[in-house]
Amino acid sequence: TMKEVIDKMNMTEITSVYGLTEASPGMTQTNAADTFEKKVNTVGTPFPNVEVKLIDPDTGEDITEVGKKGEIVCRGFNVMKGYYKNPEKTKEVIEDDGFLHSGDLATIDEDGYYSIVGRIKDMIIRGGENIYPREIEEFIYTIDGVQDVQVAGIPDEKYGEIVGAFIIKEEG
């Protein structure tokens, strides 16, 4: 974990950068002066001259509510012009207004710090309800004796998908 890296390697000024190859070198970053909690629980605030926002993945509407999940998108000098000789793929990820879709789900806090909470493609849709595997995994990790867990959608005739959890128990 980030705490272990900071403690064991005495890297007190470590920061986190979030971004994609398509938005190099990144979109957001924590700062060395940020609190420990901000460093380990968020991916920071936007780089200068880079616009970052959250949108509803279904409607494309902006999300400004603190703590509400949405797709993190950005535009700025860091965003690629497009995929080489692949305008169709480019059109899928870059809007006409220049915003690049990350495919990642995030929240924003009251201080403007973003936290990545999952991937859109990983989302399980059960009877019209959006379920985020990462939330379930984090809960299962709180159970004593769990070493690792992976949650995925399993096809279901009635609901479209149901939740499956694959758990590795700790030895002993």
Named regions from a protein language model:
Residues 53-73, 92, 110-111:
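Conserved beta-loop-beta connector loops within the AMP-binding
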Residues 76, 81-82, 105-172:
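AMP-binding/adenylate-forming catalytic core of the ANL superfamily
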Residues 10, 49, 89, 145-148:
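Glycine-centered tight turns that cap/initiate beta-strands
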Residues 1-38, 51:
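Gly/Ser/Thr-rich phosphate-binding loop
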Residues 19, 44, 104, 128:
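Active-site glycine-centered loops adjacent to acidic/histidine catalytic or metal-binding residues
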Residues 41-46, 94-97:
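Short Gly/Pro-enriched turn/cap motifs at secondary-structure boundaries
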